[in-house]
Amino acid sequence: MINFLTLSEVLQILENQVRNYGGAYGVRDMHLLSSAVYMPESSFGGNYLHETIPAMAAAYAYHLCQNHPFIDGNKRAALASSLVFLDLNGYEFECDDDVLYEKIMDVAKGEVKKEELIKFYEKYSRER
């Protein structure tokens, strides 16, 4: 069984990021937030559109970052949500912090397509 994140959990992740690193807490657009949070569990014909746990984690990172649903902390919440999702599903993510930072910044700038981010997550994610 896959442990998907709920809206409430993503909001808790944002709150934690803002509390620890600063910024303003709040949702700019609840519809964009809902869209991003539920994207990883989207399916068609009984099959998930994102077929692997790392691909689903990448979908959290990509859509939360691109949808920009929060007042502040979008990149931090996107990254943290993806890593929490991996952890909840028995995966670890091992990547140099600088490489990860650059990748998330590139996603935010629109320079990385979702397929590329999925490959990135598949490269650095391992089952525990």
Residue ranges and their predicted role:
Residues 1-128:
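FIC/Doc superfamily catalytic core
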